[in-house]
Swiss-Prot record:
This is Argininosuccinate lyase. The lineage of its organism: Bacteria, Pseudomonadati, Pseudomonadota, Alphaproteobacteria, Hyphomicrobiales. The keyword Nucleotide-binding does not apply. Its EC number is 4.3.2.1. It holds the Pfam family ASL_C2. It catalyses: 2-(N(omega)-L-arginino)succinate = fumarate + L-arginine. The gene is argH. One of its GO terms (biological process) is L-arginine biosynthetic process. It is found in: Cytoplasm. It comes from Rhodopseudomonas palustris (strain BisB18).
């Protein structure tokens, strides 16, 4: 005869392989806090509705508090034979308070129980990631303010395009992180409905109060359809999608740090705190923190893809396939959180080389667009014509092996006679960035204003709690 809590209709014990594939405690033990909180809310509701006695509910709550303390202290004995966190908690509760523990599962199934636990877990995770992203934004905006005037090359196709400031470049990632935070917050709003009380799939005949348990657990409302409540994993998928986009943003910046710190580029240096050495090459300083932050993206995207594939063919309602929803997601959320912290640390740590940045910003005829703009503005030339003229001037400078501002005025006038000495004034990288005063542009005064506004906004968020 089976000794499982669900084993009443079984006459044989499960095969060892069945037990091995069925067990989930190694993963869902991380839901212990959420499982205990949901059980306490459920017990209180059962008592309020007269389904269990107040005495039993009190003993259940006391026993659950004891279990929580044991788990936090590391003294709780998790048993793989009990399969999951729910049965481990219930078994220990039975040891502590006796038969009253068996009343806790009235009007509840593991189906709505695990759905509730995981929603609470993902909600807590979102709050933690949001706080980490806010710290990352603060680090970026702080350094952007410091380097609002530090000129560097802006790139398209990884070719020098136009001069920008280092502060402007950093502020781009502040904006990306803001959208990431918005996506996480949107996901949080949609997940914040309670499955508890949906039971196995059809609801329950007991006179439960789902609004009460939803409120007790901080949910906005109970989920409206019991089938949906136990079978939905949209909330994990949506959060993983937000995490994947955030990870891609981090990966793009991490890649830039790897490039910038290369001796071939040399625009930025990381301290020993965020680099490692080589076991054979004593001179090496490898940007491993950036490389690993970049690599974490694969784990996050992989978790999203994996769960999409798990869910794509599942009919309503709960299927055991859904047990595979947690490990990949938990690992992905942990990887993202670590990558955010690592990137925040590197942002605060990195030391730009303004001289090298300025030199690089002037290479590749990066101020050619400024000359074209001058032709449009001063000579009233159509932009397409100005583009063509400037292209010919760049070609001549390249042919002579000189920078654009080093090309003699006479050589420019041979291509366009109306060009004057004034045109040369727009060809410095400093004048180029200062001229980009349009909203969202790289002008230092814009960058300072944006960085200050973000720092003020983040401080207000922090103070409002």
């Amino acid at each position: 005869m089976s000794n499982k809590m669900w084993g009443g209709r079984f006459s044989e014990r499960p095969d060892a392989i069945m037990e091995e594939i069925n067990v989930s405690i190694d993963v869902d033990r991380h839901l212990y806090a959420q499982d205990i909180a949901a059980s306490k809310a459920h017990a209180a509701m059962l008592a309020a509705q007269g389904i269990v006695t107040a005495k039993d509910a009190k003993n259940i709550a006391k026993g659950l508090d004891t279990i929580l303390s044991e788990i936090v202290a590391g003294s709780f004995d998790f048993k793989r034979a009990l399969e999951d966190i729910h049965m481990n908690v219930e078994s220990r509760l039975s040891e502590l308070i006796g038969p009253a523990a068996g009343r806790l599962h009235t009007a509840r199934s593991r189906n709505d129980q695990v759905a509730t636990d995981f929603r609470l877990f993902v909600r807590d995770t979102i709050d933690g990631i949001d706080a980490a992203l806010a710290s990352y934004q603060h680090a970026l905006a702080t350094r952007a303010l410091e380097h609002a005037d530090t000129v560097m090359p802006g790139f398209t196709h990884l070719q020098t395009a136009q001069p920008v400031t280092f502060g402007h470049h950093l502020m781009a990632y502040v904006e990306m992180a803001a959208r990431d935070r918005g996506r996480f917050r949107d996901a949080r709003k949609r997940l914040n409905e309670s499955p508890l009380g949906a039971a196995a799939l059809a609801g329950t005949s007991f006179p439960i109060d789902r609004d009460a348990t939803a409120k007790a657990l901080g949910f906005e409302r109970p989920m409206a359809n019991s089938l949906d409540a136990v079978s939905d994993r949209d909330f994990v998928l949506e959060t993983l999608a937000a995490a994947s986009i955030a990870a891609v943003h981090l990966s793009r910046f991490a890649e830039e740090i790897v490039l910038w710190t290369s001796p071939l580029v040399g625009m930025v240096r990381l301290s020993d705190k965020f680099t490692t050495g080589s076991s054979i090459m004593p001179q090496k300083r490898n940007p491993d923190a950036a490389e690993l932050a970049r690599a974490k993206t694969g784990r996050v995207i992989g978790a999203l893809t994996g769960l999409l594939i798990v869910m794509k063919g599942l009919p309503l309602a709960y299927q055991k396939d859904m047990q595979e929803d947690k490990q990949g997601a938990m690992e992905a959320f942990a990887a993202l959180s670590l990558a955010i912290r690592a990137m925040s640390g590197m942002v605060s740590d990195l030391v730009p080389d303004p001289a090298r940045m300025k030199q690089a910003a002037g290479e590749g005829y990066a101020t050619a667009t400024d000359l074209a703009d001058w032709l449009v503005r001063e000579l009233k030339m159509p932009f397409r014509d100005a583009h063509h003229v400037t292209g010919r001037i760049v070609g001549e400078a390249s042919k002579q092996g000189v920078a654009l501002h080093e090309l003699p005025l006479a050589e420019m006038q041979a291509i366009e006679p109306r060009i004057t000495q004034q045109a040369l004034s727009v060809l410095s990288v400093e004048s180029s960035v200062k001229s980009r005063v349009s909203y969202g542009g790289t002008a230092p005064k814009n960058v300072r204003a944006q960085a200050k506004a973000w720092l003020k906004r983040l401080e207000k968020e922090h103070n409002s709690g």
